[in-house]
Amino acid sequence: MEPRCPPPCGCCERLVLNVAGLRFETRARTLGRFPDTLLGDPARRGRFYDDARREYFFDRHRPSFDAVLYYYQSGGRLRRPAHVPLDVFLEEVAFYGLGAAALARLREDEGCPVPPERPLPRRAFARQLWLLFEFPESSQAARVLAVVSVLVILVSIVVFCLETLPDFRDDRDGTGLAAAAAAGPFPAPLNGSSQMPGNPPRLPFNDPFFVVETLCICWFSFELLVRLLVCPSKAIFFKNVMNLIDFVAILPYFVALGTELARQRGVGQQAMSLAILRVIRLVRVFRIFKLSRHSKGLQILGQTLRASMRELGLLIFFLFIGVVLFSSAVYFAEVDRVDSHFTSIPESFWWAVVTMTTVGYGDMAPVTVGGKIVGSLCAIAGVLTISLPVPVIVSNFSYFYHRETEGEEAGMFSHVDMQPCGPLEGKANGGLVDGEVPELPPPLWAPPGKHLVTEV
């Protein structure tokens, strides 16, 4: 049994807390376990005391207060009620001032990361340019600039795809600058007809695809250069994955341009230039990831994959085991067949992968009874292996998607200002002076894309 307090002590006093019409009763000793919080500090709590009803009144979210009061009763255990949205509960926790440690544990339990601060440049002109290119939601001009950037990205991707069509592709392997590297002294025209020695050769710089590509690269380079010059921190800028993607998007053009100029001057080997340009052309396809800067859906997909790396790793590991196991089994089951496609275990890897992923091209198929049994088991094992981690990945996607939508809805609403019930004399022990309204702490949670901004 707990020792009883002497009569003069007020720690056993029963307090009535009225939260939006719902009355709670507890002891002052319970709230006093955390004296740095709003309810644990008598001076701060007294601002909300109603003398007429002899109770403390808080016009706040009622379902959240059960967990807040349990935090005091349990000695520091904070659990969000299942029917309370995360952003609403975090606002209530911030209002009652339960502390950074409790919020950190809650974020860890909920899997809610702290939004990183996005610094702003000190100079006004640099700050305007940074907001214009980095924050599309900051102004109407920034939205227009984002639309232009998306259109340029789409044009670049369309050109990348169109130049591989037979009607536009030369007989040589490659297009644009890569095509010229293999063309020799007499490149073929766009219509595919043969180029006679008497006709002037078509240089790659006159190619319409090259012109459009050059215009797109000029825009990408200008955009990247402006953001690099006005960014508040060069270290943070180069650590950003999106900025690295922007750099990779323009790098192939300049490498291909330098290779082509060197080829025309007779510097370097033509075969080596063609090999380099083929790799460079493949890198150009990564330009499509620039759209993720302007697409919330791609950002949510990236967050889902990042949060599901463990499950994806297990999936790849299970597939690896299954591929080795079933490719070995089908090889020994079909080894006696003269016309067998399974000539070795490595040759059977392709069949095992296609079968376990339930694609089934049919280019390789077992013929013997034993091989068919192995194929059936391989297909069943593939279905089970792939289906196991899928619910976890879907759950992660649903979590990030709802967090994004709830964050957008939260920005449309604001709380009614809490007005204390009466004045409090002095400001001792953390109290407030007469007429002062307690301020809410700064926002401790923000949806993806809504970051705190500070000047550096």
UniProtKB/Swiss-Prot annotation:
Catalytically driven reaction(s): K(+)(in) = K(+)(out)
Domain remark text: The N-terminus may be important in determining the rate of inactivation of the channel while the tail may play a role in modulation of channel activity and/or targeting of the channel to specific subcellular compartments. The segment S4 is probably the voltage-sensor and is characterized by a series of positively charged amino acids at every third position.
Top-level division of the source organism's lineage: Eukaryota
Alphabetical list of SUPFAM superfamilies matching this protein: POZ domain, Voltage-gated potassium channels
One annotated Gene Ontology cellular component of this protein: voltage-gated potassium channel complex
Similarity section: Belongs to the potassium channel family. A (Shaker) (TC 1.A.1.2) subfamily. Kv1.7/KCNA7 sub-subfamily.
Sequence intervals crossing the membrane: 144-164, 209-229, 241-261, 276-295, 312-332, 373-393
Gene responsible for this protein: KCNA7
The entry's keywords: Glycoprotein, Ion channel, Ion transport, Lipoprotein, Membrane, Palmitate, Potassium, Potassium channel, Potassium transport, Transmembrane, Transmembrane helix, Transport, Voltage-gated channel
Gene Ontology annotations of biological process type: action potential; potassium ion transmembrane transport; protein homooligomerization
Upper classification of the organism: Eukaryota, Metazoa, Chordata, Craniata, Vertebrata
Assembly: Heterotetramer of potassium channel proteins.
Pfam families: BTB_2, Ion_trans
Protein name per Swiss-Prot or TrEMBL: Potassium voltage-gated channel subfamily A member 7
Membrane topology: Multi-pass membrane protein
